[in-house]
Every structure is written in C-alpha cells, then in structure tokens.
C-alpha cells in the first residue's frame, strides 16, 4: 500500500499521567462535538465533568466551582449555537483558566468584542502547518508543527479586540499569502483558544498543549507566573506578520469596564425574565414607555445652549461624587431648572448606577409638560442593552466609537433607530469623528476626556467642529465646570453641553445652571402666586350656582352619589349645568395670560393641572362620584356636560386615565399615591366621606405637603368663611401648595346653602 504521508500522532498505548490535584474539577462544556476530549484531559491527570451546552444553567455551573473550564468544538455559529458557552466564558474570565477549541475559540473572540467569518476555504480533517508564538499552550513546542482542521469559520483580523492577541496562524491554501487565525490569547487573563483540534490523531503535540493548559491554576497569566509582555525564552517561532499580536499594554480602565460589563450582561441574558426573548416579548406587547425625539428635544432650551444634565454617583477618575444621590429626585431638579436631556449612568461598579435608576428617573418625569429626553449613559456593545434601555424608558443611548468596530457601531446605530431612538454617538479624535459623520449620526458628542488616559482637554470639541455638517447637533462632553468653559462653545456652533460632577456637587442646581449657561434663573418656569381656586360643593339649585359664579367661584360641585343628602337629580343637575356654562366670570376675575414661561420649559404636572382647572372665562362644573361604576360615571359626564369629575371613594387610581375630563381625587391624610403624577389632575385632601365639617389636623396636613416639593392640593374639611384664610396662612410657605379650597357644609345654614356665606367664603379666599 502506498504511503499516504500522514502520520498518526495518537497515543497508541497511552500511559495515564499522575492525578493532577490542581485540575481536580475540570468542567468541559460540550457543544455537541466533543468526541473523546474528556479522555485526553483525563490522560493528562485531570478529573473531568462534561455538560451539554444547553443542559446546565450558568448558576448551576458556578455552584460546581470548576478548577478549569474547557469549551469544546461544535457545529454552527458561536453567537447562536453555543448555548451556555459564552456566558460561562464571560463569568469565569479572570477567575479560573479557560481553554477553547474551534467553536470554543470563536466564543472567546466574540465574547471580547471580535467577530468570526468564513475563511474562504472549508477544511474538515485536513492538515496544515502551524506557526505559533511559543507561549501558553505552545510552550516548549517546535517552531512549526502539523495540525488538523475541521472548520469554515475563524476570527477576523480587523475585529480582534485590543485585549486579545493572535497566538498562531496558518496560511491559506490559495497562494494568496493570507493567513487564518488559529489561536488567540487574552493579554492579561488566563483565557486561550485554538481553532484546530489538538485531540486529532493528525495533530502533533496535542497532549502537550492540553498538559500546558492543565498546569494553569489562576485566572490571570501573572497569577500563573507567566509574563507575556516580555519575549518568552521558549519562543521558537513567530506568528506571521499578518497576524502579529498588537503591542501589549496595561489594560486600560475602559477595557476593564467593557470586559466587566460583557461578563455581567452575559450572565443577565441567561436569567429567566431577563433573557433577550423575554425583553422582546415585553416590547412586542407595547410596554415601553412613550418617548420623545432626542434631536428635537435637544433643540429646545430656555438657554443659549442646551443642557444635558448627568446623574452620576461616582467615576473612575474622581471616585465617589454623590454616593447617596436619589436619581429620580435629582432628575426632577434638573428638569425644573431647564435641562433638555437627563443623562443617567447605569454602570454599577465604577459609576454606581443601574438600569433601575433610569427606570425611576423616567417615572419621576411623568406628567411634565415638556419633559427632558432621557439618555442611557452606558458602555453599549449589544442590542440587548439598547432594548433594555427602551423598555426602562430611555429616549436615546450612548454609542462610543472608540470601543466599537465600524461594523458593530453601524449595526447598533440602526437597531437603536429601529426602536425610535436616535443615538448619541461619542467621539474623541478626528478619525472617530469621520466615522460618526459617515454613519449619518444626527447627534455627535465630543468627549473632552481621553478614555484611555482620562486626561481632559476642553479644546477637543473645538478642534473637531470643522468636520461636522451644519445640520448635525454637536454636544461637548466632560470636564465642563463653569461659565468660562462654555463661552467658546457658543461662538463655535456647539449646540449642547453635558455636565455631571459639577451639577451633582452644586448647592443650588437652578442657579448653577443659569450661571453656567449665561442665562438667568428667570429663564425657567416660575409660578406666580395666585389666590387658590374656589370650589363650592354640594350645589343643589340654580340660584346657589349663580351666586357662587357671580362671587367669583372657579368650580361648582354637584353630588351624584345616590343616598347622600346633597345628591341632585339629573333634571336639576342639567339646569345647574346650563347656568354654569352660560354665566361668565365677573369682571376682574379672569386670570391674566401666562407670561414668562418659555416653550422649552418643563412645568410641573400639578401646576399645569391647576392652570387647566382655572378656566379663563367661566366656572367649571364638577360631578362628585363615590364608588360607582365607571360606565355610570362616563354616562353622567356626557349627559350632564361635566367639565370635571371628582372621585370621592376607593376608585382605582387608573380610572383617571379612562375618564375624558380632568379628575379630582379625594385622599385622606394617610393614603398613598397622593402625589402620583399623570393620573388625577389634583388631589383633594378631606376627612372621611366629606361634607361632615370635620377639620383636618394642621400638623398632619403640613407633613403631607412637605414630603414633595411638586405636590399641589385642593384643601377641604371643615372650612368656612371665618377660618379658611387663617388655616391656609398657618401652613406658612407650604400654603403655596394649596392651589384650591373646597367648601360644602361651611356655606350652609340649617342644612341649606346660604348665599351670603358663599359670597363671604369666596371673598375670604380671594384675599389670600
């Protein structure tokens, strides 16, 4: 038989090595193609446990406390067919040694940000000559050796991230002098992969490669006594010039953050309820909160430049800034001070933020007349993070050009836009700016901080302005702390600035923002003091309605609750409705036109609601209901032409969104949700069922009002012409939050409405 030239390198009569105590619990993730791997590992003294990639969870894997992790070959693509493999690599990187073969190596490449693609040739069971760097798995091996390949995919040179180095390669068989990546290695972490099959009978020194790996015990090369930043004495050959590893350097803080986030996101994606499919299902159910267009909102500002106000508890460069900051409370301050965008850092380790911060910020801005857009400030590298941001209420996300390949950046950019979010694309150099402009980004942020050295140069933004089309919004990011920092930006066409640390430390947020942007604190909405709305409730006749309106009452209440003494039948209610809608407010009672509130300003929800309830030309008719069916309430509203509905029982809070007119809702002093925005137009503080003449405890009223600076209420309970002014005045500064007063029994005599008392009550309130 003719000699084929093939050499069988398998161990024909293998001798099992002594038990390795350091490899006492090797976990092999089987990607449905592991063949006899466990046998080869056992031959080198390892104790091996094998698990299919879809038959163990990451939590179960962690609980088994492996000493080393091996990822096997397998069919398909690493991003779709490797099961738990990638999540395991992300979690265990830096903790224990990891070795990947074929698809296992491809998982390593994609986990750290690289890409795999077709090699241009399909080799299954073919041998090639390997060139390697003599380190890691190749330590002590000859310069060139034969290996066996079973693959059509491999890592691509252009996408290998800085944290990885190419450790071996083979030349293509097409005489192109191009090579294919056969091995990669993390520069700091004990993570290594090979594209070929060491266990094949046609691969030389396969057992030695396994042995070299099983000697490793620590999660870093340094921990294993390996210093790959210096040329190894055992290196017998170098990888070809096309695959030469990039110059090693100290892992930058940005790379460390990215590596950590990749690991965390990989784990999160395996948790039931947080998996990509779970998020997509929630999005498909239209559960993402309403959004505002990011570029359009950036163009709206009460100041010469738009402000992107950042919520940041800490940073790698400054350490702890505001550990105890309440993100939603901070967001409301920023919004009321005129911010166009609120940036929420959601990275937990270095910046001490979370996606829950963003969710709470979005909820806190509900009901503002022109709420700021919300930016998820995060190290984004996966569509999953963008979808997560949208579901939490983000209007835009940050994409950092420095950390993304052009291919990945483009993919993430268009995915974000598909969710209705124009991203903020961050750059720092002319090269990165060109990428952002070519991408077609509508909003580009120039980071004045070098993310490698963390040095700040405020001139960075200025130097890049001439590369940007006039239609593009340019934002200056980082290092801005005072008015002098932004003066040049105004002249150069910069449209917005992002400020974080200085804002978090400011004693008076509104004053600092006004001074910073060269405006005035008057540029943002300032509510002028008006006397409270007057609501005359329990109206039972046309005469009483007419007297109340002519005295200057704003709201005429009629009781629609069957069985109550003040309940009016529909025919009487219709006649009262006609009176309310036909009699104008008396001269001098028409409120002045609102002045000094720029269109870009965000008005607090309850302030806006109070304006709506103060009709410019007539009183409004309020129908009072208590624990009655929603259908009945809606029917009566249409039949009687009610301008406002008052819910005085235990109706669901959500009904306010189902009723087509403003809703006043009664609350007791101990009831929750009194200050919940975007449901009831105004809360009404009252005792019991109302109409009893029982005064509320003044100190408890004060406590309720002091809990929320944006709360506005209608005050009821025992008020009459003789005490209403004094009760409101005793509340001091908190009395400004009483935007309406409600009276029923306080304007009655012997159970009937007293027209004189009605007039006296209105007059007393107008004097406040």
UniProtKB/Swiss-Prot annotation:
Active site: 102, 197, 199
Domain Glutamine amidotransferase type-1: residue ranges: 25-223
UniProt GO cellular component terms: cytosol
Function: Trifunctional enzyme bearing the Gln amidotransferase (GATase) domain of anthranilate synthase, indole-glycerolphosphate synthase, and phosphoribosylanthranilate isomerase activities.
E.C. designation(s): 4.1.3.27, 4.1.1.48, 5.3.1.24
Keyword Glycoprotein tagged: no
N-(5'-phosphoribosyl)anthranilate isomerase: annotated segments: 533-768
Pathway: Amino-acid biosynthesis; L-tryptophan biosynthesis; L-tryptophan from chorismate: step 1/5; Amino-acid biosynthesis; L-tryptophan biosynthesis; L-tryptophan from chorismate: step 3/5; Amino-acid biosynthesis; L-tryptophan biosynthesis; L-tryptophan from chorismate: step 4/5
InterPro entries for this protein: Aldolase_TIM, Anth_synth/Amidotransfase, Anthranilate_synth_II, Class_I_gatase-like, GATASE, Indole-3-glycerol_P_synth_dom, Indole-3-GlycerolPSynthase_CS, PRAI_dom
Region (Indole-3-glycerol phosphate synthase): 253-517
One Pfam family per UniProt: IGPS
GO biological process: L-tryptophan biosynthetic process
Sequence positions that bind L-glutamine: 74-76, 106, 152-153
Protein's recorded name: Multifunctional tryptophan biosynthesis protein
Molecular function in Gene Ontology: anthranilate synthase activity; indole-3-glycerol-phosphate synthase activity; phosphoribosylanthranilate isomerase activity
Source organism of the structure: Aspergillus awamori (Black koji mold)
UniProt superkingdom: Eukaryota
């Amino acid at each position: 038989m003719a000699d084929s030239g093939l050499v069988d390198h398998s161990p024909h009569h293998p001798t099992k090595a002594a038990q390795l105590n350091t490899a006492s619990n090797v976990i092999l993730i089987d990607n449905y193609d592991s063949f006899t791997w466990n046998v080869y590992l056992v031959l080198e003294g390892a104790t091996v446990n094998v698990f299919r990639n879809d038959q163990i969870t990451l939590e179960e894997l962690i609980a088994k406390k492996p000493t080393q992790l091996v990822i096997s070959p397998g069919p398909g693509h690493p991003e779709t067919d490797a099961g738990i493999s990638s999540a395991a690599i992300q979690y265990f990187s830096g903790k224990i040694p990891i070795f990947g073969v074929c698809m296992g190596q491809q998982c390593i490449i994609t986990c750290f940000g690289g890409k795999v693609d077709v090699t241009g040739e399909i080799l299954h069971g073919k041998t090639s000559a390997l060139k390697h760097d003599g380190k890691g798995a190749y330590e002590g091996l000859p310069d060139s050796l034969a290996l066996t390949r079973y693959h059509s995919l491999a890592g691509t040179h252009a996408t290998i991230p800085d944290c990885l180095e190419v450790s071996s390669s083979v030349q293509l068989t097409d005489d192109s002098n191009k090579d294919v990546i056969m091995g990669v290695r993390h520069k700091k972490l004990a993570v290594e992969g090979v594209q070929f099959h060491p266990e094949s009978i046609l691969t030389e020194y396969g057992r030695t490669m396994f042995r070299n790996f099983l000697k490793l015990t620590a999660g870093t090369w340094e921990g294993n006594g390996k210093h790959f930043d210096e040329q190894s004495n055992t290196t017998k050959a170098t990888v070809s010039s096309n695959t030469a590893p990039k110059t090693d350097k100290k892992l930058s803080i940005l790379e460390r953050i990215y590596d950590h986030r990749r690991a965390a996101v990989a784990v999160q994606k395996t948790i039931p309820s947080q998996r990509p499919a779970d998020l997509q299902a929630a999005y498909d159910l239209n559960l993402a909160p309403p959004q505002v267009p990011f570029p359009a909102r950036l163009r709206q500002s009460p100041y010469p430049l738009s402000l992107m106000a950042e919520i940041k508890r800490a940073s790698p460069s400054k350490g702890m800034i505001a550990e105890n900051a309440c993100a939603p409370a901070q967001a409301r301050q920023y919004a009321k001070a005129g911010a166009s965008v609120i940036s929420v850092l959601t990275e937990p380790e270095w910046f001490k933020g979370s996606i829950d911060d963003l969710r709470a910020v979005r909820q806190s801005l509900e009901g503002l007349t022109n709420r700021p857009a919300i930016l998820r400030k995060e190290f984004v590298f996966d569509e999953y993070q963008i979808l997560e941001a949208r579901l939490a209420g983000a209007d835009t996300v940050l994409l950092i050009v420095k950390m993304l390949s052009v291919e990945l950046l483009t993919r993430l950019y268009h995915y974000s836009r598909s969710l209705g979010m124009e991203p903020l694309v961050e750059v720092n150099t002319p090269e990165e700016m060109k990428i952002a402009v070519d991408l077609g980004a509508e909003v580009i942020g120039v980071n004045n901080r070098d993310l490698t050295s963390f040095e700040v140069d405020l001139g960075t933004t200025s130097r890049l302005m001439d590369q940007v089309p006039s239609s593009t919004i340019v934002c200056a990011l980082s290092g801005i702390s005072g008015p002098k920092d932004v003066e040049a930006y105004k002249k150069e066409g910069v449209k917005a600035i992002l400020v974080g640390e200085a804002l978090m430390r400011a004693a008076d947020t509104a004053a600092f923002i006004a001074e910073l942007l060269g405006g005035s604190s008057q540029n943002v909405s300032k509510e002028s003091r008006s006397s409270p709305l007057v609501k005359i409730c329990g109206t039972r006749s046309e005469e009483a309605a007419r007297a109340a309106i002519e005295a200057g009452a704003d709201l005429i209440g009629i009781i629609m609750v069957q069985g109550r003494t003040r309940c009016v039948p529909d025919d009487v209610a219709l006649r009262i409705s006609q009176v309310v809608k036909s009699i104008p407010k008396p001269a001098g009672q028409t409120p002045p036109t609102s002045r000094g509130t720029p269109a870009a300003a965000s008005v607090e929800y309850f302030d806006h609601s109070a304006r709506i309830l103060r009709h410019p030309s007539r009183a409004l008719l309020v129908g009072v209901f208590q624990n009655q069916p929603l259908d009945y309430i809606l029917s009566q509203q249409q039949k009687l032409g009610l301008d406002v509905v008052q819910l005085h029982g235990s109706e669901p809070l959500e009904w306010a969104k189902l009723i087509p007119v403003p809703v006043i809702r009664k609350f007791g002093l101990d009831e929750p949700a009194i200050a919940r925005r975007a449901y009831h137009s105004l809360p009404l503080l009252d005792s019991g069922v109302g109409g009893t003449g029982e005064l509320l405890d003044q100190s408890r009223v004060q406590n309720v009002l002091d809990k929320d600076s944006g709360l506005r209420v209608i005050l009821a309970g025992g008020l009459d012409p003789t005490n209403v002014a004094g009760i409101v005045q005793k509340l001091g500064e908190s009395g400004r939050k009483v935007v309406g007063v409600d009276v029923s029994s306080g304007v009655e005599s012997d159970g009937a409405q007293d027209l004189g008392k009605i007039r006296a009550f209105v007059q007393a309130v107008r004097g406040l």
